[in-house]
C-alpha cells in the first residue's frame, strides 16, 4: 500500500513539474495558432480599353458578353470587340441614338437589343432596325433598360415600361395608370419566365407575375428617403437604379445601398457594415442566389455570400488594386496583374 501511494505521489510531482516546465519554456518553442487564410476570391488579369485603342468613347454605360464577343454601349456609339479588333456602330448605321444606355441578348437568334437616348435598336446579322415613339408603340425614346425573355422584349423608359411581343409585333404599355408605380422613371428591368422586375426611380421595385398578370410594388417601408430606420425591414431606398433576378432571388441596387430579397426576407448592404466601397451603386448583377457584382462610384465589388472583394484603380498610377474583406471584417490587400492598354 505504501509503495502504491508513493508511486501515485511521484507521478503527481512529475506532472506538476512538466506543467511548470511548459509554462516556463520560451515562447518560440510553443506552436503559434495560424492566421486565418485569406478567402479565395476571383482574381483577374485586367486589360483596359479606351479611345486610344478602339473604343468610340471612354464613357461606358453598358457591357454585354456574348461568347467570345463583347458589346459595349458608350456615349458615342455601340462597339463590338471580336477577334482582338473593335467595330463601331453609329447613327449612320441605323442606331437610334449615339448614346447607348443598355444592352440585352436574344439568345435564340443572337440578336442584340440596345436601349439608347433616342429609341430602341435591334442589331441582327449586321442589320440595325430602330424603334421610336414615332414608328412604334415605345412609350418613350429614352430607354434605360432592356431585357429579353422568350418572345418578349421588356423595356424600361423615362415614361414607364413597355413590352414588345416579337411574335405578334404588339406593344403593351405600363405606367401609373395600370401599375402601382407613382413615378414613371424606369431605370432597369430583369425578365425571367416567372417574374419581371423593374427598377423605378422614386417608386422602388415593381414586380410582374407572368402567370397571373399581377403587379406588386416594393418600396422603403419606413418612408424615409435618406435614413433607414430598421436595416432589414424592406427595400433599402425608393430610388432604385437596377434590378437582377436570378435563382428566385431579387438583387436591387440604389444610390443609398443595396438589397437582396428571397421572397420573404430582405437583407440590405451598406458600406458601413459590408464590403461595399460605396453606397452609391449604379448596377447590380446577380450570379446566383448567393453571389453578386456591384458597380459603384468608388469601385467594383463582388460578394460571394460571406466575403467581399473590391477592385479599384490605384490613385497613384491607375493600375488595378484588389482588397478582400472576410466575414470578421478584416480587410487584406491582394496582388492582381494588368496588361498594357
Regions found by a protein language model. Give the residues of each.
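Carboxylate-rich, polar loop motifs that coordinate divalent cations or form catalytic acidic clusters
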Residues: 3-7, 12, 23-341
